[in-house]
Amino acid sequence: EWLQCNPDKRDHQQLRNWLSKDQVQSTQVLIGQKTKPKMERWIRLLKPDNPNNYVSRRKTKKQQIFEILNENSEICWSEVQNRVNAPSQALKKLKEDGHIEFFEKRVYRRFMEGGLPEIEPFKELTPEQKSVFEKLSDSLKNGTYRTYLLEGITGSGKTEVYLHAVREAHKLGKSCLILVPEISLTPQLVNRFRSRFGDHVAILHSGMDDGERFDEWSRVRHGFASIVIGARSAVFSPMKNLGLIVIDEEHDPSYKQGETPRYHGRDVAIFRGYEAGATVLLGSATPSLESSNNVSN
């Protein structure tokens, strides 16, 4: 299934190579009913009606529907039901007369309901932040794998560096993966990204129901969202043209999964960055011994 949905042919070949060398093992697991896309019934105007056909002072249901469709040539069935009392028979007659047609449109279930937060401007970077960002920018433009460790206490401005780096990658047409510990995946953090990048941001974590996760995953897979924010399992997101991976609080033990399949989200992210030729940025106030040792060497 992964081979069928993953768009990167290089990944296909790499996985086949690992399988042929017995470096990975293929298993079969029976799963329950799959989550399906959520569909809504919509109405499309095909042939406007002549208003002279109606001489009554009181608007008929057909007239009300035509007025709505003149404002929006396509509209959700439920919206018409909200604005016109019991419209089913009138809609059926309009369809028979060839004025309208019914069709289904996919809608995406979103974990964070409501509109996008108010747009926030990017803050000007301090000299120290700018020095870090310039290195990240050069790496992104070169398109070669590099890993960096950014050490700074909470509130020191690491997130603002992340935001600027994501904007740079976004300008270059590259997708971005931001991993954070589950406990840190707060609405405030997510809205800092959504207020700057809008619907390009997708969220993936365990607090979502199956439908919400499925739809966010689908938005990423189809390229509607190029910036993913999530906990450790988000590292497996089906991203195209991956250019930047940020692992915040890289020392956090929650990146390790104890259940099968066991993996370390940070290490998988670094390896994925290596395979994709992406820039990887580790951030922490107290870096892990492994990362500190890698920097020293």
Predicted segments with their positions:
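Accessory, non-ATPase domains that flank or precede helicase/AAA+ motor cores in DNA-metabolism machines
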Residues: 1-286, 290-292, 296-297
